[in-house]
């Protein structure tokens, strides 16, 4: 399934618990709770540019090639080396503290992250 598109967050589950386990402070968790997140994905074969635009003008962009080590930035702002894999149509990556999958389901981008038994799910609807 092609990932290229622009997606706006419409729902999330277990936000507070997941962010606390990541070590994000309560004030930052509260501040970010109502952020409108727009994710833009450009896919060219195995090459991806994955950008998340947050309320207030902050943007985080990761560029990676499936199967090759890349510098990846986490939700918490830390950068590390990781290899993104494609497994059954899902992008899969192991961050230092959590595991994440991303997939297209119908016209939705579904991102699932797991840490310490807590699963955070963010669902975004396709805008373009």
UniProtKB/Swiss-Prot annotation:
The keyword rRNA-binding does not apply. The modification N-acetylalanine is found at residue 2. One of its GO terms (biological process) is negative regulation of cell population proliferation. Keywords: Acetylation, Cytoplasm, Lipid transport, Lipid-binding, Membrane, Transport. One of its GO terms (cellular component) is membrane. The keyword Ligase does not apply. It holds the Pfam family Lipocalin_7. Isoform 1 is expressed in the jejunum, ileum, cecum and ascending colon intestine. Isoform 2 is xpressed in the gallbladder, duodenum, jejunum, ileum, cecum, ascending, transverse and descending colon, sigmoid colon and rectum. Isoform 2 is expressed in colorectal adenocarcinomas and their adjacent normal mucosa (at protein level). Changing residue 79 to M: Probable risk factor for type 2 diabetes obese individuals. GO terms for molecular function: fatty acid binding; lipid binding. Induction: Isoform 1 is up-regulated by chenodeoxycholic acid (CDCA) via the FXR transcription pathway. Isoform 2 is up-regulated by NF-kappa-B and in all stages of colorectal adenocarcinoma. Isoform 1 is not up-regulated in all stages of colorectal adenocarcinoma. Belongs to the calycin superfamily. Fatty-acid binding protein (FABP) family. Forms a beta-barrel structure that accommodates the hydrophobic ligand in its interior. Can bind at least two ligands per molecule, however, the stoichiometry is debated. Binds to bile acids and is involved in enterohepatic bile acid metabolism. Required for efficient apical to basolateral transport of conjugated bile acids in ileal enterocytes. In vitro binds to bile acids in the order: deoxycholic acid > cholic acid > chenodeoxycholic acid and respective BA conjugation modifies affinities in the order taurine-conjugated > glycine-conjugated > unconjugated bile acids. Stimulates gastric acid and pepsinogen secretion. This is Gastrotropin. It comes from Homo sapiens. The lineage of its organism: Eukaryota, Metazoa, Chordata, Craniata, Vertebrata.
């Amino acid at each position: 399934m092609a990932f290229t598109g622009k997606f706006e967050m419409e729902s999330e589950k277990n936000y507070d618990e997941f962010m606390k386990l990541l070590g994000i402070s309560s004030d930052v968790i509260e501040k970010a709770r109502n952020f409108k997140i727009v994710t833009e994905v450009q896919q060219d074969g195995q090459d991806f540019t994955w950008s998340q635009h947050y309320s207030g003008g902050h943007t985080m962009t990761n560029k990676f090639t499936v199967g090759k080590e890349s510098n990846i930035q986490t939700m918490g702002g830390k950068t590390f080396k990781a290899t993104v894999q494609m497994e059954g149509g899902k992008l899969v990556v192991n961050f230092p503290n959590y595991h994440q999958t991303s997939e297209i389901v119908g016209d939705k981008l579904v991102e699932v992250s797991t840490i310490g038994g807590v699963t955070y799910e963010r669902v975004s609807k396709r805008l373009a």
